[in-house]
Amino acid sequence: HPLSKSAVYNNVQAAGAQAIRLRQQWVTGRAGTIQALGIDFTHVKRLGQDTIVAVATSILSGAALDFDIIDDESAETIQAWVRELCERLQVEVLVSDDADALKTVADELGLEHQLCRAHVNRNVHALIGALGTQALEHPDPVPDRSGLTVAQLLDDLQQLEEIIKGLPYDGQSQLDHLAERYQTAPPPSAMAKASMLYRLRLLTLDWSENWSRLARFQHWRGTHGERLDGTNNVTEQIIGQRVKERYRTMRGYKRDASILNVSSLIGWIGMQGPDYNLGELI
């Protein structure tokens, strides 16, 4: 007799719960061996409500280490989620996007921090494109006393993008020089929009202060000489293949447990070889 939909559902949930237990056992046995932890977040619907799924991976091996549901993406919430995992595994480096909350988490946990270059490049390219368009089409007035010009700003935007993309050996000093050039750009008055000079002041200062997080991979080496590639692509791929791919065929989840069970089941099977015994999941 064919299985009913409810029987299939129950079997998948039970297998997912078992996959979570197996993964937790596997992670416990890797204490001290996972030096670089990638984290990222995605959103799915549960009974029509937005639900945040947090995902942690081993950047060097590509293994999915944890799936969890969190209330928000604040530093406090993320730190509460990831602290125990980092301590248990003795993680050295956190790899993530460039959200301020994640910088705080890395600092609070005493971890080295690598920002995802792909994510940063996209964000910086968009910001520079917007500033460049404004400077070309409807530039703000440039105060005479600043010693700056629109042409100078356009040149500096190009230089900034080249620094962020190319990560030259003297990137820190180049960024410091740019940040110094715009440090006198005045902040906007109440209810006014920030000028293009002030926006570039913030942008150059931000990357001057966070250069080490962007270029960390150039110097970091694992215990056995492992290298980072400077991206969080591993975690993004896990989200795409283990969380989002299944979600696309559904109209949403009904329970938080279902989100974790299904993602964990797919994630666990994805880590196994072609001869894996599925009987482990029964």
PLM features per residue range, with description:
Residues 47, 65, 103-104, 125-126, ...:
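Short helix/loop capping segments that flank catalytic or ligand/cofactor-binding pockets
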Residues 1-2, 242:
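DNA-recognition alpha helix
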Residues 93-148:
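Conserved beta-strand -> loop -> alpha-helix junction used to position metal-binding or nucleic-acid-contacting
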Residues 99, 144-282:
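Acidic/histidine-rich catalytic cores and adjacent linkers
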Residues 43, 100, 122, 239-240:
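Short hydrophobic/aromatic residue motifs in ordered secondary structure
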Residues 5, 117-121, 232, 236, ...:
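Alpha-helix initiation and N-capping motif
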